[in-house]
Amino acid sequence: MKKQYVSLLAIILSVSGFLFSCLDKMNKNTGALQFDSIQVNKTAHLFNDTAKPACNIIINFAYPIKSSDDMLKDSLNTYFISACFGDKYIGEKPEEVVKQYTENYISEYRRDLEPMYTEDEKDKEDESSIGAWYSYYKGIESHVQLYDKDLLVYRIDYNEYTGGAHGIYMATYLNMDLTLMRPLRLDDIFVGDYKDALTDLIWNQLMADNKVTTHEALEDMGYASTGDIAPTENFYLSKEGITFYYNVYDITPYSMGPVKVTIPFAMMEHLLGSNPILGELKN
C-alpha cells in the first residue's frame, strides 16, 4: 500500500511539473497578456428617418483584459485608447470609451449635416437627387499583430468617408516595448547619424521591389510625388526586419495605395543599436 502511494505521488508530481513547464512556456511573453475586443456596427439616419441618408460606424477595438502586471495592462490601454480614439478618452474604461465615441460620432454627424440636408431638400424637388455624400462612414479596427517576449506590435486600421470623391484609409503601428511600457521610436533602434544611410536603404529596396535601377525611374512611376521618401515613424518590427509603412499620399498618389518597404536586419547591422528587442527578433 505504501509502495502504491509513493508511486501515485511520483506520478502526480511528474504531471504537475509538466503542467507548470507548459505554463512557463505559454507565459514566456512579458506580462502574460490576454486580449479581448469590443465590436460595434451601428447605422444612424438623419432625423431618425430610415428614408434619409445615414452614417455607419464600425469599431473593433482590441485591448488587454488580463496581465501579470496591472501597471503594464493599464499603460497599454492608455496608449491604445489614445491612438484609436484620441486623448480626450484617456482614463475611461474601454467599454465606456467605445460607447461614448460611437454616440459622439452619430451626434456630430446629425448636428453637422441635418441643417444642410434641410436646405438641399428645399432647393430640390426630387429627394433622391440629393448628393450621396450625405452617407458617411467611419471604421476603426485594431489588432495585435505580434506579441513576442518584450515586444508587442499593435496595428490600427482607420477608414472614413465624409463626402467628396472618395474616402480616406490608413494604418498606424505601435511597437510597444513592454519593459519600458512605451512605443519604440527610430532613435531607440538606430544609432549615430543614421537617417541619410537609412534613406538610401529605403530607396534601394524600393528600386529592387519595383525592378528598376534609378531614382528617376521610381519617380516616373509616381514615387516621391506627394512627399519625400525618408524613414517614417510609422513602422513595424518583425523577425524579417523593419517595415516602413507609408499611407496614401505620404509618398505616392491615392491611386497607388499604401507602400510597404521591408529592410532586413542584415542590411542594417551597421546602423542598429543594442536594443535587446532586436536581439530577440534576430534569434
Where are these regions (language model features)?
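Bacterial Sec-dependent N-terminal signal peptides
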Residues: 1-34
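Compositionally biased intrinsically disordered regions enriched in Thr/Gly
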Residues: 22-283
